[in-house]
Amino acid sequence: MTIRSPEPEVKIAVERDPVKTSFEKWAQPGHFSRTLAKGPSTTTWIWNLHADAHDFDSHTNDLEEISRKVFSAHFGQLAIIFIWLSGMYFHGARFSNHEAWLSDPTHVKPSAQVVWPIVGQEILNGDVGGGFQGIQITSGFFQIWRASGITSELQLYSTAIGGLIFAALMLFAGWFHYHKAAPKLTWFQDVESMLNHHLAGLLGLGSLSWAGHQVHVSLPINQLLDAGVDAKEIPLPHEFILNRDLMTQLYPSFAKGLTPFFTLNWSEYSDFSTFRGGLNPVTGGLWLTDTVHHHLAIAVLFLIAGHMYRTNWGIGHSLKEILEAHKGPFTGEGHKGLYEIFTTSWHAQLALNLAMLGSLTIVVAHHMYSMPPYPYLATDYGTQLSLFTHHMWIGGFLVVGAAAHAAIFMVRDYDPTTQYNNLLDRVLRHRDAIVSHLNWACIFLGFHSFGLYIHNDTMSALGRPQDMFSDTAIQLQPIFAQWVQNTHAVAPFSTAPNAAASTSLTWGGIDLVAVGGKVALLPIPLGTADFLVHHIHAFTIHVTVLILLKGVLFARSSRLIPDKANLGFRFPCDGPGRGGTCQVSAWDHVFLGLFWMYNAISVVIFHFSWKMQSDVWGSVSDQKIVTHITGGNFAQSSITINGWLRDFLWAQASQVIQSHGSSLSAYGLPFLGAHFVWAFSLMFLFSGRGYWQELIESIVWAHNKLKVAPAIQPRALSIVQGRAVGVAHYLLGGIATTWAFFLARIIAVG
C-alpha cells in the first residue's frame, strides 16, 4: 500500500477536481477493474463483480484514493438511511392509524401498512382498533413519535419531506467530496481533530439539541397527553417554544428564566429535569424528565470530551503519545505501533468500531425492555419482542464483522517488521496458548451445560423428578446474579439515597407497573432454569469467539500453512497436492463463526421470549392479581431439552401454524417460505463444486444439441462463493422463520 509523503507546512486539506464526473464509467459495470471491465465471458463474472465492487483495496493501492472512496460511500449510506426514515414517517402520515393510537394507546394497536385487495390479500388487514384495518407493526415508531411530541399527520409529513431533503444533501455531499473537493490523506489521519469534532459535535451538541427539544417540545406535549388532553387540543410545538407563559403553567421554574442557571441554583429546575428512577405509571415508560436530565448530562460530558485533544493550539492530549506511554511492567512495548496501524489501516479501525458498536447494540437490546424509554412501549409486547430480537441479531452480525475486518487487516495491512514486542506482536506470539485454553473452556462449558440438561431429561424420562436440577428438587440457584439484582433493588435506600426508585423494576422489590390492565414491568425472578440456560449462553458465546479469534490470530500463518498471508483473505485450499488444507482461510473462519453466532443469538432470543411470557408479561386484574401469558411455566419446563421442544417451540408455534385463513397468515406463509430458504441453503453447504460443474457441462451439451447455447459460458460457483450463498440463505431462512414464529405468537396472545 503506497502512503504519500508528508505535505508542506501550510495545511491544505482538500484537492480540487481530482476525479472527473463520468457517466460513461457509471454505465460500465466493473470499470474499476481491468479484468471485469472487459465484460462477461463466463457466469463467474457477475459473482466477481459483486465481490469486488466495494472492495476498494482491490481497485487501487493508494491509501488516499481508498479513503476518499470509503468517505464518499458513507454519504451514500446516509442518504439511503434518510430515504428509509422518510418512508417510515410518510407511512405513519399516509397509511396509519397514528392519531387513533395516540388517543387510546392501550387498546388501539399500531398499524402503518394497508394491503391492497389483490387476489384476496386484503385478509391480511386485521382489525387493529380505532376503526382501522391494517397490518400491526412492531417497530416502535409510534412510541418514539409520542415521546418526541409528534401529535399530527402534518408533522409526520413535514419530517418525511425533511428526510428527503437531507437524503438529497447527502447524495450531493458524496459526489462533491469525491469529484469536486476531495480530502487529502492527512485530513483522514488527523485523529485528534476527528475526535474533537465527533465527540463535541455529534455526541455533545447532538445530545444537547435533543435535550432542548425534549424540554421545550416533548415534555409539555407528553404531560398534556398523559393528563388525557386530546391531541388536537394541544398547542403546536412552536407555541411552547415562543410562549413562556404556556410553559410556566406546566413547569413553574420557567418563570425564573436563566437566573437559577447562572446563580447555580440548579435544583430550581427539578420540575423538568429529574432523577426519579422507575417508570411513569401512566405510560409504563421511563420518566421523560429523567431522560431529559440524562441527555443534558451526556451533552456536558461529551462537550468536555470534545475539547481534550491537541490540534492547532498545542494543548491537550496527543493520541500517539497516550498509546506509546501505555505500557506495563509485563507488556513489552505496550501499545507502541498501534497509532500507525489505526491511521493507515481502515480495516483495523473498522474492526475496533464494529466490536464496540456490536457490543453496544446488544447492551441496547437488554436496556430496551428493562428500562423502556418510550411511552406505552412496555405494554406493546410485540414491539418489545421485536426490538430485543432485532438488536440482538444486529449486534451479533456486527461482532462477526469485527472479526472479519480484523482478519482482513492481518492479511492485507499488517507489517510484522514494524510491530516488534508490542501487545499485538505478543498476542500473536502466544496465540497457541490463547486458542488451546479457549478451546478447553469451550469443551468444559459445552459438556457441563449440556450435561445438566441431559441429566434432567434422563431423570424426567425415568420418572424421577426428585433427582432433577430444579427449583423444587436439587437447586442450582444463580446466587451471584441474585446478589447483583438485590444490590440494585435496595440502592434507593442505601447507595443511591436521592433516587426515588431503582434504575429498573426488573431488579426486584414489590413494585409492579401495569398500564391498561397489562403488565408493563415487574421484578424478574431468577432460578435454576436461568442458571442452566445462562451456561448455554456462555458456551455458545465462547465457541463463537474461539472460531473468530482463531481466524484472526492465524490469518497470516499457521503451522499447517506458514505462508498463508500470500494466499489472501479468502481461498478454498492451499493448492492441489496438499490435502487437508481446505477451509483454513480467514474468510472460512468468518463463515463458520456466522453459524455459531446464529446459535448463540437464537438461544438468547428464545430464552428472552419464553421468560418474558412466563414470568413478566400478562394481564392484571382489579385486585392486582397477575395472570402471565404462559402461567409461569418457564422455571419447570425449560430445565429439559424436551421441555424446550414441547412447551416452547411446539406449543408456541400453534399460532403461526394455525394462522392460515386469518390476518396472521401474513406470518404463516413466510414461516413456510423461510423454512424452504433455510433448507435450500443446505444444497449449497452439503455439495461440492465438482458435482455442479459436471452437471452444468451435461446441461450445456443439451443446449448445444438444440443450438441454443448461451454466449456467456455457465460455470459452477467457486467453493467460496457456494459457501457464501449457503450461509446467506441459512441465516436469512433461520432469521425469517424465527421472525414469523415470534410475531404470529405474540400478536395473537399479547
Swiss-Prot record:
It is found in: Plastid, Chloroplast thylakoid membrane. Chlorophyll a binds at M683, Y691. GO terms for molecular function: 4 iron, 4 sulfur cluster binding; chlorophyll binding; electron transfer activity; magnesium ion binding; oxidoreductase activity. The gene is psaA. It comes from Huperzia lucidula. This is Photosystem I P700 chlorophyll a apoprotein A1. The chain crosses the membrane at residues 70-93, 156-179, 195-219, 291-309, 346-369, 385-411, 433-455, 531-549, 589-610, 664-686, 724-744. PANTHER family: OUTER MEMBRANE PROTEIN, OMPA-RELATED, PHOTOSYSTEM I P700 CHLOROPHYLL A APOPROTEIN A1-RELATED. [4Fe-4S] cluster binds at C573, C582. Belongs to the PsaA/PsaB family. PsaA and PsaB bind P700, the primary electron donor of photosystem I (PSI), as well as the electron acceptors A0, A1 and FX. PSI is a plastocyanin-ferredoxin oxidoreductase, converting photonic excitation into a charge separation, which transfers an electron from the donor P700 chlorophyll pair to the spectroscopically characterized acceptors A0, A1, FX, FA and FB in turn. Oxidized P700 is reduced on the lumenal side of the thylakoid membrane by plastocyanin. The keyword DNA-binding does not apply.
